[in-house]
Amino acid sequence: MTEVKSGLPLVSVLISSYNHADFIEASIRSVYAQDYPNIELLVVDDGSRDDSVAVIRRLQEELGFHFLPQANKGLCTTLNEMIARSAGLYIAPLGSDDLMLPERLSLQIAFMEQHPETGICAGGIVLIDGESKLLPDKKQRYRPARRLDFDDLFMDRKPGPPAPTLLFRREALEKVGGFDPSIRIEDYYVELRIAHAGYFIDILEESLALYRVHGNNTYKNRRLMIETELEIYKRFEDHPGYEATRLRYLNAMFAKVASEDRALASELLTQIPWRSRNLKTLKGLWRYCFTRAA
């Protein structure tokens, strides 16, 4: 793919594969189905325990992309190492269970080339299940195009960019030092840092990727997720909207976990002052008092 001399900027697509033997082939082939002509594909298997390596090696022999199997290092470290080895002016991480739609990169690059102030370009997603069937329309997420600055993202004024569609300007990623291995919610934190550095995040209205919803990609450790999100907010505690953002999140998470983890719900509730409680708090209290935890 990198032999093409199109005059268009090179895009480095990075796939960090982990235990997705059933899905990785579709992800890789979706990269080769792009109508954008100047792409390099780097694939790393990050210590999978299934047949992912065998599947990827077979595809590598057929298609000729860069492939490296390794012991598990974690997603952020792996992505940073892949970025260092890549050559593209634009970086497109792709989940090893997700798929690019054919016009994705051509639409994003056309936009990014016209908007040097944009550090990240994203777009809509279409939800599919583990068998690649579309989820019902009521579960799909159709949203208009939008531009986000730091305040929009940090204070949740507008819906953020769908992770399966993120395209980074290399310059922006390098300016903030890449992904932070100490933060588990890697996409949200790097988005905030890039926006904080003065770049915009633009989300196109077009659907650009198929996002696979299946049993192995749900975030099961709710406590760790909440602690990580609060740690991300704390790294921007000098922002005037920090306390409002933190309290809004605590209220929302209390309502969400009240019926499933009473101990965690109690801890969250103690962090919400009476004056900052709202309808979500009341909803959570109802669930806490009248719903039996699973």
Specify the residue positions occupied by each region the protein language model found.
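Glycine-rich, basic loop-to-helix element that forms the pyrophosphate-binding segment
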Residues: 70-86, 107
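A conserved acidic beta->alpha catalytic loop
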Residues: 30, 45-54, 73, 95
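Conserved donor NDP-sugar-binding/catalytic core segment of glycosyltransferases
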Residues: 103-136
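Conserved nucleotide-sugar donor-binding catalytic segment
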Residues: 84, 142-232
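Acidic helix N-cap motif at the loop->helix transition within catalytic regions
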Residues: 22-25, 50-58, 99, 103
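N-proximal low-complexity "stem/linker" segments adjacent to membrane-targeting elements
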Residues: 1-32
